[in-house]
């Protein structure tokens, strides 16, 4: 199945950001190639992921409600103004995480990092917002990896939200680092810290809970995490399973490939309102039809240009294999 097109209709912008601009809330998920543990939750990987998130926030300006990166997949809950902003943040975050964590000193992975492009799924109601936040927080605990969401050693928003503080990460400017090392004398060594910037990851309140005080919001998240912990403990008791734990997690190779990877299909949209859900599905189908027609018209215009022979004209593959 091909990756769905990014589509955010005006009707999906049901909330506003701090500037009063209409926004849509999107859950973004992504998985490593073959489910390999390239996102191993070391302190260094955690810091690098948080640095990418913090820098992306500063450059793009989207709202971030939650994040959770396990050993082989990551999830974000974000508020965006349109599809262009969504595309920018996905490209920036996923591209830079792959470049940093694929380096020799992290996972020594030179090939393709992600199994597919990130999957954005719109969230359309307040109830769905709370449900997706709970699901994101449960990552790591529901899999039996740790006993509480805040115990996950990797990049996870639970601890920051429960303790009412912000996470911080680092961004290494590789271009600056190479330049410094190229111009350094033999007597002076250049450290990575000379090209490192620290970033704060700002977490926003869910739009449906934006009117709560900081203390009230923190208490709701704590209660949610406590409930997740109790539910996971009951599940372990019924199945006689044990928690994997931090030490065993960190002993695993970043090249470890699990025996099974969840292949369940992603929903088209998160919406408990069946009428609204059906409206969105029909609107998406109409959008795809219009998008395909526009691509065909653009292809015709491109082929009318005087393109030198010997290469592949832009949109030639679209004409041969329509979306």
Predicted regions and their residues:
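Short catalytic/metal-binding and nucleic-acid-binding patches
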Residues: 1-323
């Amino acid at each position: 199945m091909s990756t769905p097109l990014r589509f955010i209709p005006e009707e999906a912008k049901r909330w506003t950001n701090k500037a009063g601009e209409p926004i849509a809330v999107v859950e973004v998920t992504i998985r490593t190639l073959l489910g390999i543990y390239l996102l191993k939750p070391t302190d260094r990987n955690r810091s690098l992921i948080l640095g990418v998130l913090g820098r992306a926030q500063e450059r793009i300006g989207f709202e971030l409600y939650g994040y959770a990166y396990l050993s082989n997949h990551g999830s974000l809950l974000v508020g965006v103004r349109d599809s262009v902003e969504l595309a920018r943040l996905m490209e920036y975050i996923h591209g830079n995480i792959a470049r940093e964590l694929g380096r020799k000193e992290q996972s020594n992975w030179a090939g393709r990092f992600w199994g597919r492009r990130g999957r954005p799924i719109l969230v359309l109601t307040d109830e769905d917002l709370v449900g997706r936040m709970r699901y994101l927080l449960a990552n790591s605990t529901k899999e039996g990896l740790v006993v509480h969401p805040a115990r996950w050693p990797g990049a996870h928003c639970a601890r920051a939200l429960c303790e009412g503080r912000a996470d911080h990460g680092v961004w290494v400017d590789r271009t600056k680092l190479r330049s410094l090392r190229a111009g350094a004398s033999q007597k002076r060594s250049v450290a990575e810290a000379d090209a490192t910037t620290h970033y704060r990851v700002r977490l926003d309140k869910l739009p449906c809970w934006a009117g709560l005080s900081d203390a009230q919001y923190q208490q709701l998240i704590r209660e949610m995490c406590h409930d997740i912990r109790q539910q996971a403990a009951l599940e372990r008791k019924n199945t006689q399973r044990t928690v994997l734990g931090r030490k065993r997690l960190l002993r695993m190779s970043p090249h470890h490939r699990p025996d099974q990877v969840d292949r369940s299909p992603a929903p088209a949209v998160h919406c408990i309102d069946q009428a609204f859900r059906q409206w969105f599905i029909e609107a998406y189908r109409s959008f795809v039809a219009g998008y395909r027609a526009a691509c065909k018209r653009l292809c015709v215009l491109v082929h009318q240009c005087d393109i030198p022979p010997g290469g592949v004209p832009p949109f030639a593959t679209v004409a041969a294999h329509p979306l």
